[in-house]
Amino acid sequence: WTTRGEWDIIELTNNKTRREGVDMNRQSIVIDRQYGSGGREVARILSEKLGMDFYDGNLLVLAGKEYGIDLGTLQTYDEKGVGSVLHDIALMSNTAYGSNINDAPFQAFNALSRLVQQLVAKGPCIFLGRCTSHILKTEARVPFVNAFIYASNMQDRIERARAVDGVEIGRIEAYIRRRDNQRKNYTRFFTDKAWGAPENYDLMLNTSTLGYEGAAQAILGVLEGRK
């Protein structure tokens, strides 16, 4: 496996070269995913096949540089960083103290939203999570394919979690559930949409049966059908 950090570096350095080969008439792709389902690998495969830029954690790095926002702040309110943070903020929303801190997560999200809109204005991209489907639909208003990647076999998720993040075997299932809940809470907080609900996606793809390549091919099939 290529580590998460390595892919962030690869994507940041390859943006310019990949953009040259992109078909500007293609639609963008948004992938939401269960933790450990291989959604990132599916996005990588699509990026290689289509020559389209692929954005995940590197969005935070780019947003921080573009808008002068501390990377730590962006990470605190990112889908990987939230736990009880957004829940606590929601509970304090009607208090005087809460009103002073409530702006922080929305400032972080608005920075990501502005960046996503800038990126798709230059051409179609591939995005992982972070409510980018909401941004593309309500703000950028560009066409896109929206897929949810899941794995019905927990063992598949466990093996990927160990390989990618090095999670200890004794706590791995609890870790997987926590990461899913973080993504669910992030989506609900910023969009009021249900993360993983079939009605919010064009495709629901099971990598335990399709594999990463099969899931990527299914998304390519939808793109081809929309030409």
PLM feature segments, named:
Residues L115-D165:
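ATP-dependent NMP and nucleoside kinases share a basic, alpha-helical "lid"
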Residues I9-I10, N14, E20:
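Short, positively charged and aromatic/hydrophobic N-terminal segments
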Residues N25-I29, G123:
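Pre-Walker A (Motif I) flank of P-loop NTPase domains
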Residues I31-R44:
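Glycine-rich phosphate-binding P-loop
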Residues G64-P124:
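ATP-dependent small-molecule kinase phosphotransfer cores
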Residues D53-G64:
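Short beta-strand-centered segment that lines the nucleotide-binding/catalytic pocket of NTP-utilizing
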Residues G83-I89, E168-E213:
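Small-molecule kinase domains that catalyze NTP-dependent phosphoryl transfer to phosphate-bearing small molecules
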